[in-house]
């Protein structure tokens, strides 16, 4: 089974109202949204602790980006949920996610929560 197949199905079926299509780029899954923005999902499969990044690119629309990741970037070590952190509209505006993310949550469910967040923003 392809690495991103389950995530593509989640996006295309559960979020069909805002997702136009998905594209497996090999190292990441790209999700195209109705507002002409896109979300990239990438994650590791070889580390003991799964690392992931969910990045929503909107710079061409309103100069914003949103990104949730758990890379242990020391720059964000003061964030309460470190290593998990959320880039809110700008790369250097970082804090806790605007939705709950339990450290035991499966990546598929974290992905769903991010897509719900994107749905609210894209249709506002």
Model features per residue range: what roles?
Residues 1-40, 45-49:
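Negatively charged, low-complexity tracts enriched in Asp/Glu with abundant Ser/Thr
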Residues 3, 28, 36, 63, ...:
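Context-gated lysine
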Residues 3-6, 14, 37, 81, ...:
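Intrinsic disorder/low-structure terminal segments
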Residues 31-33, 39-41, 52, 56, ...:
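Generic hydrophobic secondary-structure signal
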Residues 36-38, 48, 61, 73-75, ...:
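Generic "edge-of-domain/loop-turn" microfeature
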Residues 43-45, 51-55, 78-80, 111, ...:
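Generic alpha-helix signal with a bias toward terminal, lower-confidence helices
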Residues 53-101:
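An exposed acidic His-Trp-rich patch
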Residues 90-124:
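Well-ordered alpha/beta subsegment
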């Amino acid at each position: 089974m392809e690495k991103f197949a389950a995530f593509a199905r989640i996006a295309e079926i559960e979020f069909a109202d805002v997702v136009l299509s998905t594209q497996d780029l090999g190292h990441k899954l790209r999700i195209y949204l109705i507002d002409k923005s896109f979300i990239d999902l990438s994650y590791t499969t070889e580390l003991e602790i799964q690392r992931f990044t969910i990045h929503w690119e909107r710079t061409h629309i309103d100069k914003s980006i949103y990104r949730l990741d758990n890379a242990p970037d020391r720059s964000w070590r003061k964030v309460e949920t470190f290593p998990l952190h959320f880039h809110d509209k700008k790369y250097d505006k970082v804090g806790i996610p605007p939705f709950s993310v339990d450290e035991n949550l499966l990546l598929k469910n974290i992905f769903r929560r991010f897509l719900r967040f994107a749905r609210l923003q894209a249709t506002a």
